[in-house]
């Protein structure tokens, strides 16, 4: 039996609407169940990304850390040219800070990193030998 699957990711946001605009710019579909303070986006492979006001979490867990938060969010793509397409798509998007241009690594990757409007780091990449289905299922090899 497979272990539990990651299928719901919540991001605490100081500006929920700005972050929602960012996800829409990536082409993600917003759920009709969204509310102004609680936005839901359907990603690929069944994952749901929820955006909540940061104050709700700070009351429960304490203040958010500034700077790198110890994790990155990954968008794995089906082909190396998709990396360049997404890079072009993100140029000029409010709050998307492109940290580097797409590059080829000696480890078989093509990718780049960006910071979203809330300061989260995203890695956008293609990896030689891996497959991504149209539904977004990733097979890592």
Residue ranges and their predicted role:
Residues 10-57:
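Core segments of cupin and vicinal oxygen chelate
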Residues 20, 59, 84, 122:
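Alpha-helical elements of the RecA-like P-loop NTPase motor core of helicases
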Residues 2, 5-14, 41-42, 62-141:
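Vicinal oxygen chelate
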Residues 21-25, 86-91:
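Short amphipathic alpha-helices in soluble, non-transmembrane regions
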Residues 1-21, 73-75, 127-141:
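N-terminal beta-strand motif that seeds the catalytic metal site of vicinal oxygen chelate
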Residues 26-27, 81, 94:
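Structural motif
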Residues 56-62, 131-133:
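A short, acidic/glycine-rich surface segment
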């Amino acid at each position: 039996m497979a272990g539990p699957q990651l299928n719901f990711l919540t991001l605490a946001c100081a500006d929920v609407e700005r972050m929602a605009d960012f996800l829409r710019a990536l082409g993600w579909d917003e759920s009709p169940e969204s509310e102004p303070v609680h936005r839901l986006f359907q990603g690929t492979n069944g994952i749901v990304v929820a955006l909540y006001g940061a104050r709700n979490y700070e009351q429960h867990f304490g203040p958010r850390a500034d700077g790198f938060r110890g994790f990155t969010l990954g968008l794995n793509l089906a082909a190396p040219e998709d990396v360049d397409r997404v890079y072009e798509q993100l140029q000029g998007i409010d709050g998307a800070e492109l940290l580097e241009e797409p590059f080829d690594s000696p480890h078989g990757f093509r990718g780049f990193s960006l910071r979203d409007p809330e300061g989260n780091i995203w890695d956008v990449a293609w990896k030689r030998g891996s497959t991504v289905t149209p539904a977004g299922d990733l097979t890592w090899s």
